[in-house]
């Protein structure tokens, strides 16, 4: 049974004003027809009500984000992951973020028919991540291993293999070999893929028999690429159109979960030997690109220690085409490609082929397709060493400070939430429509 906590001391009256505004929004929604059936006047009326409530959410959280977070996490003694945090906030502070019931209704609808309650989650997460107290604590919570990974770990240590829906993980010769295996959809990303990837990354980092990690796409059954390896087609636009891409469980978890773990490692308890000098378990990572790395696939390459590509591969971040923000690529791509090429890729949708000179800004080695296997093994051997591990840690600290990443992700939380419900995004992905995923 959930319990609503006593309200915070509302000396400035912001909480009372917010709860009243949130109640007014719900009362108005109850009188209106479904999203797509509203008149222009009705759309303007509910937009104004949402805007007033959201302005109050921002003002309330600008002042009280730390107090809210401390209430939810027992003064930062409890580590809540993103989904747990927003669910706890919905219970403890009614009207601050959407309820589970509201979100369940939204999940049953295509993107174009949703009310956009996830925007309120974006407001909340931006405030939490902006905080120098709450933000680092949330990042640490997301660096901890998932319960699913901890459950699978003993079996993986024993057998060296785990088969999941979207990822096959095998330990061989000290290497954790992660193969993305959504063969029917070109490794397009969805919530299941994010969950499987985080589980696989956790297992690779936690297994003491693993020294280096490798990520590669598997062989496809998709008609256009049957029998060929493909790295990743990026976000599943069909699922986005159908309403199956979540702000918290996909877009935010992806960045703060397994991708951040590729950079920083997995955070462990203080009962592990050597914890005092290294609270996180980190390992070097190699990525090998066959075919293409589009969108989220290209974003991934920016956090790997070494990237290989077949000579016929290409890379793109079609953010302008899709209308959304390409994860943390806006933060990272400029370090590799410089400001001009970064803008061409992100703002104009430029595609970079592996044989172009600019590809060497993104890829360490380009080889003929039949030579890629051998190049992978050479790279894995090269990165297997304690000195590599220590230096990649220092390089990552110099390249991307934890506070800089946190500040970026704070703005990303709200900006991406707004993009999800932008009219241009809904129009662009509408051609991928269909029934919502089960």
UniProtKB/Swiss-Prot annotation:
Annotated residues for binding of substrate: 183, 189, 222-225, 233-238, 296, 325-327, 416
GO MF term (any one): identical protein binding
Entry similarity comment: Belongs to the enoyl-CoA hydratase/isomerase family.
GO biological process: antibiotic biosynthetic process; fatty acid beta-oxidation
Record's keyword annotation contains Oxidoreductase: yes
NCBIfam families xref list: DHPACoAdixog_DpgC
Reaction catalyzed: (3,5-dihydroxyphenyl)acetyl-CoA + O2 = 2-(3,5-dihydroxyphenyl)-2-oxoacetate + CoA + H(+)
Originating organism: Streptomyces toyocaensis
Name of the protein this chain belongs to: (3,5-dihydroxyphenyl)acetyl-CoA 1,2-dioxygenase
Top EC group: oxidoreductase
Regulation acting on activity, per entry: Inhibited by DPA-S-(N-acetylcysteamine).
Pfam annotation, one family: ECH_1
Record-linked CDD domains: crotonase-like
Keywords: Antibiotic biosynthesis, Oxidoreductase
Function comment: Involved in the biosynthesis of the nonproteinogenic amino acid monomer (S)-3,5-dihydroxyphenylglycine (Dpg) responsible of the production of vancomycin and teicoplanin antibiotics. Catalyzes the unusual conversion 3,5-dihydroxyphenylacetyl-CoA (DPA-CoA) to 3,5-dihydroxyphenylglyoxylate. DpgC performed a net four-electron oxidation of the benzylic carbon of DPA-CoA and the hydrolysis of the thioester bond to generate free CoA. DpgC has the ability to process a diverse range of substituted phenylacetyl-CoA substrates.
InterPro entries the UniProt entry points to: ClpP/crotonase-like_dom_sf (IPR029045), DPA-CoA_Dioxygenase (IPR053482), Enoyl-CoA_hydra/iso (IPR001753)
Outcome, altering residue 255 to Q: Same affinity and catalytic efficiency compared to the wild-type
Phenotype for residue 425 to T: Slight decrease of affinity for DPA-CoA and catalytic efficiency compared to the wild-type. Slight decrease of affinity for dioxygen
Organism superkingdom: Bacteria
């Amino acid at each position: 049974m959930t319990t609503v906590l006593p309200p915070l001391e509302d000396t400035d009256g912001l909480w009372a004003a917010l709860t009243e505004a949130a109640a007014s929004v719900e009362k108005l929604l109850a009188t209106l027809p479904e999203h797509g059936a509203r008149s222009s006047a009705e759309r303007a009326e509910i937009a104004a009500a949402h805007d007033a409530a959201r302005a109050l959410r921002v003002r309330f959280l600008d002042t009280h984000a730390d107090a809210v977070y401390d209430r939810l996490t027992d003064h930062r003694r409890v580590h809540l992951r993103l989904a747990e945090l927003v669910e706890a906030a919905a219970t403890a502070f009614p009207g601050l973020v959407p309820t589970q019931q509201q979100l369940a209704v939204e999940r049953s609808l295509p993107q174009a028919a949703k009310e956009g309650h996830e925007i309120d989650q974006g407001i909340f997460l931006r405030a939490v991540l902006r905080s120098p107290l709450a933000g680092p604590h949330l990042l640490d919570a997301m660096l901890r291993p998932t319960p699913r990974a901890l459950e699978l770990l003993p079996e993986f240590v024993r057998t060296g293999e785990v088969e999941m829906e979207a990822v096959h993980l095998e330990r061989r010769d000290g290497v954790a070999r992660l193969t993305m295996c959504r063969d029917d959809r070109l490794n397009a990303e969805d919530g299941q893929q994010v969950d499987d990837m985080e589980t696989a990354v956790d297992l690779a980092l936690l297994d003491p028999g693993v020294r280096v990690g490798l990520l590669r796409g598997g062989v496809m059954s998709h008609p256009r690429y049957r029998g060929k390896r493909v790295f990743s087609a990026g976000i599943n636009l069909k699922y986005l159109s159908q309403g199956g891409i979540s702000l918290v469980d996909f877009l935010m978890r992806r960045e703060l979960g397994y991708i951040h773990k590729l950079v920083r490692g997995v955070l462990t308890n203080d009962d592990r030997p050597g914890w005092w000098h290294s609270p996180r378990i980190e390992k070097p990572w190699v990525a090998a690109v066959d075919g293409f790395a589009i969108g989220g696939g290209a974003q991934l390459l920016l956090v790997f220690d070494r990237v290989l590509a077949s000579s016929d591969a290409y890379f793109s971040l079609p953010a302008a085409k899709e209308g959304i923000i390409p994860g943390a690529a806006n933060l990272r791509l400029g370090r590799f490609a410089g400001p001009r090429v970064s803008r061409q890729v992100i703002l104009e949708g430029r595609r970079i082929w592996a044989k172009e000179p600019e590809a060497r800004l993104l890829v360490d080695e380009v080889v003929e397709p039949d030579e890629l296997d051998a190049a992978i093994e050479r790279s894995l051997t090269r990165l297997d060493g304690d000195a590599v591990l220590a230096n990649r840690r220092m390089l990552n600290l110099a390249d991307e400070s934890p506070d800089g990443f946190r500040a970026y992700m704070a703005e990303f939380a709200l900006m991406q939430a707004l993009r999800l419900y932008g009219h241009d995004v809904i129009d662009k992905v509408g051609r991928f429509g269909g029934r919502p995923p089960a």
